[in-house]
Swiss-Prot record:
UniProt organism field: Staphylococcus aureus (strain N315)
Keyword terms of this UniProt record: Repressor, Ribonucleoprotein, Ribosomal protein, RNA-binding, rRNA-binding, Translation regulation, tRNA-binding
Family statement drawn from the similarity comment of this UniProt entry: Belongs to the universal ribosomal protein uL1 family.
Descriptive protein name: Large ribosomal subunit protein uL1
Cross-referenced Pfam families: Ribosomal_L1
HAMAP family (UniProt xref): Ribosomal_uL1_B
Gene Ontology molecular function, alphabetical: rRNA binding; structural constituent of ribosome; tRNA binding
Alphabetical GO biological process terms: regulation of translation; translation
């Protein structure tokens, strides 16, 4: 494993690895220890007390963060008929039918999110092996398989983020950029944490929020005290 650079070591020395900080303190410290020479993303990782091998403990969904993520998301919509005009009016970057299936099969991936109307899923299903591993396959749970393409596109453009618990029960998500104010990041964090709290499976036993940490791109992780979490 490569040794971390001097800038990282200096930044990490400001973080007490034995301490669990309040949300406010952790976000402030994560911003202060950002070492990237660009407007880094602020990421959070929630380790949840769930068993993702059980169908009723798989957590997946999407939430619109009140202050967005600071990242412009490029959207591809699979639709036909009047839904094409609806998607265009909502501000989608690309919209169409089978022609985009062919483009993707040929290696085109100039988009971040895929939305599809239910009647297009037969075509989109052909791309399962390509879109699935990249986390781009439309899914009703995240609101990306819908007839309301206007709402779907507008929410994505407004800062909607998808979340999904990985095998170890960890949910990773971006809550903004280092250039955001502390208040904006705290509000985004609280919104995501509240959504995850409400998504707790009834069959999950013991401590739900096992550990939470916030970090910036290339920066050290800062542990958050979960004692006050519901």
């Amino acid at each position: 494993m490569a040794k971390k650079g001097k800038k990282y070591q200096e930044a990490a020395s400001k973080v007490d690895r034995t301490q669990h900080y309040s949300v406010e303190e952790a976000i402030k410290l994560a911003k202060e220890t950002s070492i990237a020479n660009f407007d880094a993303s602020v990421e959070v990782a929630f380790r949840l007390g769930i068993d993702t091998r059980k169908n009723d403990q798989q957590i997946r969904g999407a939430v619109v963060l009140p202050n967005g993520t600071g990242k412009s998301q490029s959207v591809l919509v699979f639709a036909k008929g009047d839904k094409i005009a609806e998607a265009e009016a909502a501000g989608t970057d690309y919209v169409g039918e089978a022609e985009y299936v062919q483009k993707i099969q040929q290696g085109w991936f100039d988009f971040d999110v895929v939305v599809a109307t239910p009647d297009m899923m037969g075509e989109v299903g052909k791309l399962g092996r390509v879109l699935g591993p990249k986390g781009l396959m439309p899914n009703p749970k995240t609101g990306t398989v819908t007839m309301d393409v206007k709402k779907a596109v507008e929410e994505i453009k407004a800062g909607k983020v998808e979340y999904r618990a990985e095998k170890a029960g960890i949910v990773h998500a971006s809550i903004g950029k280092v250039s955001f104010t502390d208040e904006q990041l705290i509000e985004n964090f609280n919104t995501l944490q509240d959504v995850l709290a409400k998504a707790k499976p009834s069959s999950a036993k013991g401590t739900y929020f096992k550990s939470v940490a916030v970090t910036t791109t290339m920066g050290p992780g800062v542990k958050i005290d979960t004692a006050s979490f519901k």
